[in-house]
Amino acid sequence: MHDQEAANGGETATNPISSLDVPTPPATTIPTLSSPAPLLRPAIPGARSAGARTPRLGLAIPPSPNVKPVGGAPGRPPLPTLHLATPMGSSVTPHEQPPGRPSIVTQQGQSASGGSESSAAHSRSGSFGPLDGRTSNPTSAGSQYSALSFASHFGIGSTRPQGTPDPASAVGSIYSERSDGGAGMDKDGNLKGLENFDKLTIDKARTADVEDLDVEGWKIASMEKRIVELGGLGEGAGGAVTRCKLTGGKTVFALKVITANPDPDVKKQIMRELDFNIQCASEHICRYYGAFEDPSTATISIAMEFCEGGSLDSIYKEVKRLGGRTGEKVLGKIAEGVLRGLTYLNSKKIIHRDIKPSNILLCRNGDVKLCDFGVSGDFGTKGEANTFIGTSYYMAPERITGQSYTITSDVWSTGVTLLEVAQHRFPFPADGTEMAPRAGLIDLLTYIVRQPIPKLKDEPSAQISWSENFKYFIECCLEKDPQRRASPWRMLEHPWMVDMKSKRVNMTRYLAQVWGWDDKGEAKPAE
């Protein structure tokens, strides 16, 4: 009974799905994948639907300032004087700016290197705004990395142009020439002017915590052994993750330690992960606290939010071990969080490119967050990318075949992830059989591209049944044609998603039952 409750987010039922009040639509009302768009609604009777009409574009084009008067009309008045607010905060126009560099004033608790929310909304290639999968900025640094990654994958040598800085220097202002008393490091790696951790504590009038530290602050905490490890959280791609806390601090955080690789492509990948984490500030994205480099051990450490509920991968495997099954309403809340996270990333012109169960984290209260942007990529002028990186098993067909792809490739990965959690097994091959032991990655990728997509099926022997809308949602995610596959924000309008958003699910109780937490938040002793 305990296992059945855990599988249904706190609902007691013999069938984890039967308690849902989700009416199954008639078979004739379920759309088919042969329709032009994989989703949604039929045309409204009587409405004007003669096809898409080209919108009229009204442009306000200012006339030339050199145009001559017509018919004796008076000449054009002189143009107004343009007064610019300079980036340094002065209201003086550029030609009136007094000589010398104005002083930079930083507020307490804010990094001089730009750790504010306003700076987090910008990338290396320009400012961002909500986009529909399209961009107008020049090719980004992520696209440059794509070429390097693709070349190295096929053994094509590439060298960095002379004078190009090493991406590892972007960890922070390590080499500094500041003369304002700030912290810096000389060319030999010796610290100059770094305040100690106790001085930071005095300045804050309290013990410094993770929100108070900038790049130099994290380096001080590391050098003075102020980072206390509380336990391991597992191994990620390229590094170990531990649960930590600062000495005297209250916030528990996850610290991902990555061993630096001399390969410049790997360094660029690590620095891209840091860059993306700095940009992102969303309730559906794992929060980033900071990073620092340890030259003595050749490692880069990344401090991020600790999500106590664990990864979706560990959760569904624990439910499977308990003999239960994750309910449809719980999967609905997880799908909603993932799609909202992807929609936010798209507004920042970011493709995650590594959606899988282990990169979807749950907080103690059930909030769903995306993490690990180690292979995320920002896309260029057409909103597309063409690199072959990421977790291959969850890749969309267009990525496997080396074609360009968009944010909809993450929708495919979301469908594979949900199908795996619902069925308690990786969904390929579709018939549920295991591939031959000697079958490798190429065989599996070939199968994904050429064979029919897997479908979510009922399991009468286990008394498991799924709604028709959920089955169709999975089909929409696993649409092989990337032109017909819906975007994350469109999938949020899917009938199943609309229905699931109206359901109330006690995700806190669900996680407590999965992990055996008691009312005090502690793990129950094993029986």
From Swiss-Prot:
One GO biological process term: positive regulation of calcium-mediated signaling
PROSITE patterns, per database record: PROTEIN_KINASE_ATP (PS00107), PROTEIN_KINASE_DOM (PS50011), PROTEIN_KINASE_ST (PS00108)
Annotated gene: MKK2
Source organism of this protein record: Pyricularia oryzae (strain 70-15 / ATCC MYA-4617 / FGSC 8958) (Rice blast fungus)
Known EC number: 2.7.11.24
UniProt-listed SUPFAM superfamilies: Protein kinase-like (PK-like) (SSF56112)
Class of the enzyme per the UniProt entry, highest EC level: transferase
Protein name: Mitogen-activated protein kinase kinae MKK2
Residues the entry annotates as binding ATP: 233-241, 256
PANTHER family, A to Z: DUAL SPECIFICITY MITOGEN-ACTIVATED PROTEIN KINASE KINASE DSOR1-LIKE PROTEIN, MITOGEN-ACTIVATED PROTEIN KINASE KINAE MKK2
Gene3D superfamilies, per database record: Phosphorylase Kinase, domain 1, Transferase(Phosphotransferase) domain 1
Pfam family, one: Pkinase
